[in-house]
């Protein structure tokens, strides 16, 4: 049994093929999806989507969105997505360190929220780049 996975961003279809298993980062934590999963609609957090095709794992950084699972079909609508192969690990590491420093120094509610979003984005990109 397989899952039909389609990941769509506003400007492109990022992934559209059959997979064996996926692991999603939702607002309430990570969930694994296997064939014959119960129907589900989930809000996605900024994080990593892990995809298993046969014995190979792939990853992509997702920048929030929604996932709909029904009848072995998974449709993921995201604000932005980057495949791990599109991310430079060294650049992702530098961005993460910069975001971490900015978060530690952020003062005021607005600056803290902005720094936290930048940090979560950088963390997702770094995690995705190291899974390959």
Curated annotation (Swiss-Prot):
Q: Name one GO cellular component term.
A: proton-transporting ATP synthase complex
Report the protein's function: Produces ATP from ADP in the presence of a proton gradient across the membrane.
Single GO MF annotation: proton-transporting ATP synthase activity, rotational mechanism
Provide the family line: Belongs to the ATPase epsilon chain family.
Question: Membrane topology per the record?
Answer: Peripheral membrane protein
Q: Which HAMAP family match?
A: ATP_synth_epsil_bac
Put simply, this protein is called ATP synthase epsilon chain, chloroplastic
The entry's keywords: ATP synthesis, CF(1), Chloroplast, Hydrogen ion transport, Ion transport, Membrane, Plastid, Thylakoid, Transport
Oligomeric form and interacting partners? F-type ATPases have 2 components, CF(1) - the catalytic core - and CF(0) - the membrane proton channel. CF(1) has five subunits: alpha(3), beta(3), gamma(1), delta(1), epsilon(1). CF(0) has three main subunits: a, b and c.
The uppermost taxa in this organism's lineage are: Eukaryota, Viridiplantae, Streptophyta, Embryophyta, Tracheophyta
As for subcellular location, the record says: Plastid, Chloroplast thylakoid membrane
Instruction: Tell me what organism the protein belongs to.
Output: Adiantum capillus-veneris
Pfam families this protein is in?
A: ATP-synt_DE, ATP-synt_DE_N
